[in-house]
Every structure is written in C-alpha cells, then in structure tokens.
Swiss-Prot record:
It comes from the Eukaryota. Its main location: secreted. Plasma. Belongs to the bradykinin-related peptide family. This is [Trp5]-bradykinin. It is found in: Secreted. One of its GO terms (cellular component) is extracellular space. The keyword Secreted applies. Keywords: G-protein coupled receptor impairing toxin, Secreted, Toxin, Vasoactive, Vasoconstrictor, Vasodilator. GO terms for molecular function: toxin activity. GO terms for biological process: negative regulation of blood pressure; negative regulation of smooth muscle contraction; positive regulation of blood pressure; positive regulation of smooth muscle contraction; vasoconstriction; vasodilation. Induces smooth muscle dilation and contraction. Intra-arterial injection induces a significant decrease in ventral aortic blood pressure of between 5 and 10 minutes duration followed by a dose dependent increase in ventral aortic blood pressure of between 30 and 60 minutes duration. May target bradykinin receptors (BDKRB). The keyword Phosphoprotein does not apply.
Length: 9
C-alpha cells in the first residue's frame, strides 16, 4: 500500500 492510501476511498 502506497503512503496516503485511504481504506475508505
């Protein structure tokens, strides 16, 4: 997972 990833988006 890359930095700044969002599990909600």
């Amino acid at each position: 997972r890359p930095p700044g990833w969002s599990p909600f988006r």
